[in-house]
Structure formats: structure tokens, C-alpha cells
Amino acid sequence: MKRTINEVVGSTSVNTLDSSIAKKPVFLTKKQREELALKRRQDQISEQRVRREQLGRPEPETEDVSNGDTNRDKDRDRDRDRDRERDRDRERDRGRDRDRDRDRDRDRDRERERDRERDRRERDREPDRRNREKEREEEVKAREKARVEKLVEREKEKELDAIKEQYLGGKKPKKRVIRPSEKFRFSFDWENTEDTSRDMNVLYQNPHEAQLLFGRGFRAGMDRREQKKQAAKHEKEMRDEIRKKDGIVEKPEEAAAQRVREEAADTYDSFDMRVDRHWSDKRLEEMTERDWRIFREDFNISYKGSRIPRPMRSWEESKLTSELLKAVERAGYKKPSPIQMAAIPLGLQQRDVIGIAETGSGKTAAFVLPMLAYISRLPPMSEENETEGPYAVVMAPTRELAQQIEEETVKFAHYLGFRVTSIVGGQSIEEQGLKITQGCEIVIATPGRLIDCLERRYAVLNQCNYVVLDEADRMIDMGFEPQVAGVLDAMPSSNLKPENEEEELDEKKIYRTTYMFSATMPPGVERLARKYLRNPVVVTIGTAGKTTDLISQHVIMMKESEKFFRLQKLLDELGEKTAIVFVNTKKNCDSIAKNLDKAGYRVTTLHGGKSQEQREISLEGFRAKRYNVLVATDVVGRGIDIPDVAHVINYDMPKHIEMYTHRIGRTGRAGKSGVATSFLTLHDTEVFYDLKQMLVQSNSAVPPELARHEASRFKPGTVPDRPPRHSDTVYIN
């Protein structure tokens, strides 16, 4: 049954009232719902019209209610358009939000990337900053320490002065009392310099003055013979002048007396010492004690020991055999060096020798020639005695030095036919042992490899009575003291020299002879000398540990980061000359060589990490001038002779001054000049004192930073860093 809209509305209102009581739902059809919605719409339009009329607004055009379907379509279209427009607005807003979010994310990523880059730069700068801060802190601490020490020293001086004044009494200044004679002395109107009076006697106008001849071997610098001759000449001139002034002719008796006086002045007595000729113009028989003293002073030779023979002045006076003299001439040695002058005569007398000489002074020939002369007196090697081992052993700290000594020994033994064998690491020990068992007169070895051969029975030393320790201090520093002692203990001890220093040695008898050469004398070397050497003669050429005067030393203070740039600058100035760059570590050696190679330099390396074959190739290439820059560790710093090295650069300063001496000794050899440049930083304070002393002794320039540094004032270990005692009073401003 269908109902009208009014009935529906009425029933709805009634049902609404009843729903509050019965709460019974009313179900409407679709048409009823549409009519209800249209009714509500008309009610809303009526309400809006009433509201506009109340507000005085014009009434909009009303819609025809009768056109229900048309209005509904329009409403649907309008709602759809409105929804579509709203969707577009929302989509547009969402697009703007997405763009804004994307831009915000992009900005955030940029900021994060900038933060990461800034953190990366900070991390890169952090080591340099820490180093600068550390250096700054060290400088501040050093200045503060120096200031405190100065204050403490000043207070100690004040305290000492107060104690002296309390117990000894202070010196009171005395008031000068003017004597009456001085108080009332007559004052002239002129000065003493205006006095024109002269001594009337001519003898007193030109008084005779004795000339002191210091440095010519005279006592107090006075040569009595020269003084008498000058006095006689002065007297003759004065007499001639007086006779000429008075017009007196010299009588024959006076002339004869004058000749007698001149002859007496020229006559030698027991106190006179002849100065007529230099020692180089005299024969060996004419040399006096004074001549030998001048000779030793000229070559800076000093001895310590008893019954010391005279040094040799030339190869002709050396008492070497003709074969050795021919080999010396063939090697191009025209004049002996000071260490050769002093050590060869000692070796020919079978004396134990400790030689201390500067680097590059010819120490190799100083012990090789006496060794060859000693072997020449022994029976030749045969099948019967080949198994007893060599006649002589030479020990060196490094392979390169051992091979260099082998080359020199072969050169000097050219006319004698002696066999020389080197035993070093990096090669087959079986092959080296076979060479020894096949027979050789001389073995040149490193201590470690030689003791291995002895322990494995590849070699024996049953007839070895001549041993040389070259660069003994270096072997001790490298920890070879037990190996050296083991080799010396393996030698026969039946023919040791007598312990009595005054007892003469029998020249026909074979004694055990030990040569020890070193640039310095550390305690380890002294221990070996006391145990194994009998009455040794210590020969010192120059000052122990001193560098040759042919080396020009330069020290440059800088930061660690400035080293490579300064190295390139020095190498650019080098031209075609050769240079050795010393560093402390193998890693740094390879790194610097790689960077120099990239920069276009002809560079090679040499350090302990290379095989023996690689080391020989590098060294041979540098000697042959295929490379002009050698970057090396201290393996090259001792004993190795590389000719014509113009410049030595200490890229890293060594920890001990002895190693510095040997490093720069690679230049300035064989009478040629050289340059040594050292890069110094504030991390090298342990060598500041010794380096400053060496620069001062060699008349080299001392950088102001080194001269003023606290570490250069005191030798390390002599001023302990102790806290102030309770009795100390320290004032700090």
C-alpha cells in the first residue's frame, strides 16, 4: 500500500516521537527516501531565503521544485565537479608536499655530505695539529724548565753568597784615601804625550826584541841559536852605524872579533836543536827525536803503548817485500796515509794494534799489507795443511764491507798468489764451506756466518794466528760481540805474546797477532781488547770520532713535513754528481725512493730487507753512475768505499753521534772534498749536544735553533731531571 509524502512525513514525525518510547525502526522505499531528501532540500532553501531576507540580501533565483529529476542531475553534476575539483586540489597539494619533502631531503643530504667532508678534513688535519700541539707543548715545557733552572741556580748563588758573607765576612769597599803628596801635586798645563824628550843613547832608541818561534818544537817558543844570531847581527849593525856617524874605520882586529862572535852564535851546543832542514829533506839516518816529533804533529799521529817503532815516511821505508811494493804501486798508492804510516811498522813487528782513525783514511791497506807480509813468512798452502784452515781471518760487520775488503786484499795479493775467500750471509753456506776446505790463505767474513761455519764444522781455525776486526765498534753495536768472542776463542792460544811489556819479541817466531780498527772506542770494544789483545799499541789519527776536515757540514732545522721539498731542492742542485740519502727505516727508504723516482731522479735503494744479489746490483749500479742518488739505511754507513760521492744527506738523523760520523764519512774520501747536509727536527734532541760539539770542533756553522736549545747545553744523562727537594726554594714569576 502506497503512502503519500505527507503521510510519510507525518508518520515519520509520529514515529520519531514514538521511537523515543517504542524505538521501533521505520523502513522506507527508495522513492520515499528521495522524496524525503527533496523535502529536506526545500526546507533548507526556505531557511536560507528567510535568513537572507533577514540580512537584507537579494533572494537568489529559486529552483523549480517540480523539476525534481533535473535538479537532482544538476546536484549530482555539481557535486561531482566539486569532488573532482577537490580531488585536483588535494592532488596538487600532495604534489607540492612531495616536492617540498624531496627538496627538504635533498638539502638534508647536502648538509650531511658537507658535514662528512668537514669531518674528513678535520681527521686529515688532526695528526698535523697534534704534532704542532706536541711541539708547542715541548717548547713551552723546555722554556719553563730552563726558566725554573735559571731561577734555582740564581737562588743557589744568592744562598751561597749569604753563607759566605755570614761565615767569611763580606768585603767592605775601602774608601780611597788621597795622600797629601798626590793631593797637592803640581799639575802641568800639557799632557805627557806632548813630551818631546828622547833618549840620547842610540842603543836605547831601538831596543832589541826576541822573536818567539812557537810551534817549531822549541821550549817556550825560543830558539837559542836563532836568538844568538839575531843578537850578533844587531850588535854589528849598531857598531857599523856608530862608526859611520863618528867617521871611524873598522880595524882588522875588530872585524876578526866580529866573525868569531858570529861563528859562536851559529855553533850548536847541547841545548840547541837544529832547524836547518825540514824532516822531508833528511835521510832516515839523519832524523832526530825532534824531527820525529814534528813528523807526528804534522800528521796528527799519537801513540799509547811501549816500545813503539818509528812510523814510515814513504813506501820505500816501509820494509815491505818487493811483491807488495809492486802491488801498492799497481794500486795507485803514491804516498801512505797517516794510519798506514803508523800501523804498518807495528804490524810488521807482530804487535797487537788498536787503530782509531777517521773514516776514509785508508785503514784497509793498513792491516792488509802487514797481514800479507805475515803470511809470506809461513809455509805455502798444500794438501797437508789445507784442512787446518786459513792463515788469517778478517771480520767485518756487513756483507758489503766484507766484499770490499776482499777486493782490496785480492788487489794487494796480486803478485803473491794467495787465495782469498769471503763468507757472508745471503749465499749458500755449503759452497762457502767447500771453498774453505779446498784451501785458502785468507778468509774475510761477517761474524754471524763465520761462527755458523765453525759450529757446523765447515771450517776450522787450527793454524790461524792473524785476526783483524774492522769496524769493531759497529760489530758490537749490531750485537755481534758473542760471535766475535766465539771466533777468537776458536783460534789456537799456544803462541800468545808474553804478558811482560818490556820483553822483546822474537822476530823469527810466529805470534798470534790481533788488529782492531774502529772510529770510536765504546765499552764493548774495550772489553774485547782487554781480553784478547796482549800489550796493544793504540794508534790514534786525529781525534777519536772526529770527521775529516774535507767535509763541509751543514745542519738545517725544519719540520717533518718540509723534508722532502728540501731534499728535492738539494738534489736539483746536484747535477750529474752522486749523493747518498740516509734514512732510519727500510719502509721510509722505499717510500722516499719511490717518490724520487716519480719526480724523475735516477734513484736506487740499499737496505737490509733486500737479498744479497739485489744489494750487489744496487751498489754496482750506483758505483757505475747508472744511478746518481742512493737512498739507504745504516747498512751503507760503515766502511763501504764508494768513490766520488759529492753529497751525503741525513734525511733522518741517527740516534747516536757515532753513526752520524760514519754516515758523513762516505764523502770527502781519498783527499777529495765533500758536503754533508743533515735535516734536524725537535724529535732529535738526544743528539743535539754531541752534534753541536762536533760542529764547533770542525768550525762549521751551528744553527741558532740548535745553539739556543736546552738539549744542546748539557750532555744527555749529566743533568738528571729530579723534582726539587724540600730544602730547595723555587720562585716562579
Curated annotation (Swiss-Prot):
InterPro entries with a match to the protein in the record: DEAD/DEAH_box_helicase_dom (IPR011545), Helicase_ATP-bd (IPR014001), Helicase_C-like (IPR001650), P-loop_NTPase (IPR027417), RNA-helicase_DEAD-box_CS (IPR000629), RNA_helicase_DEAD_Q_motif (IPR014014)
Q: Pfam families, alphabetically? A: DDX23, DEAD, Helicase_C
Motif Q motif in this chain: 313-341
**Which Gene3D superfamilies is this protein grouped with?**
P-loop containing nucleotide triphosphate hydrolases
Q: Which GO terms describe its cellular component?
A: cytoplasm; nucleus
Q: Which top EC class applies here?
A: hydrolase
* Residues in Helicase C-terminal domain copies: 566-710
Subcellular location(s): the record lists: Cytoplasm; Nucleus
Q: Where does the chain cross the membrane? A: none
Could you say which residues bind ATP here?
A357, E358, T359, G360, S361, G362, K363, T364
Q: Which coarse location class describes where this protein primarily resides?
A: cytoplasm
- What is the name of this protein? DEAD-box ATP-dependent RNA helicase 21
> What taxonomic ancestry is recorded?
Eukaryota, Viridiplantae, Streptophyta, Embryophyta, Tracheophyta
This protein's gene is called RH21
